[in-house]
């Protein structure tokens, strides 16, 4: 079974995250990327 994605790492869907929450965050370059909460 796939392991969950830790907080702060890029994610496609909420279900992929250990926290079950993947939201858009702005990175240092001003780009918006979905990452686990």
From Swiss-Prot:
This is Omega-hexatoxin-Hv1e. The record marks 10, 27, 35 as: Critical for insecticidal activity. Its main location: secreted. Disulfide bonds join 4-18, 11-22, 17-36. The keyword Disulfide bond applies. It comes from Hadronyche versuta. InterPro entries: Omega-atracotox (IPR009415), Omega-atracotox_CS (IPR018071). The keyword DNA damage does not apply. One of its GO terms (biological process) is defense response. One of its GO terms (cellular component) is extracellular region. Expressed by the venom gland. It is found in: Secreted. Belongs to the neurotoxin 08 (Shiva) family. 01 (omega toxin) subfamily. GO terms for molecular function: calcium channel inhibitor activity; toxin activity. Pfam families: Omega-toxin (PF06357). Inhibits insect, but not mammalian, voltage-gated calcium channels (Cav). The presence of a 'disulfide through disulfide knot' structurally defines this protein as a knottin. Keywords: Calcium channel impairing toxin, Disulfide bond, Ion channel impairing toxin, Knottin, Neurotoxin, Secreted, Toxin, Voltage-gated calcium channel impairing toxin.
């Amino acid at each position: 079974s796939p392991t969950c994605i830790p907080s702060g790492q890029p994610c496609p869907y909420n279900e992929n995250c250990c926290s079950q929450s993947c939201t858009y965050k702005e990175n240092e370059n001003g780009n918006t990327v979905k990452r686990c909460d």
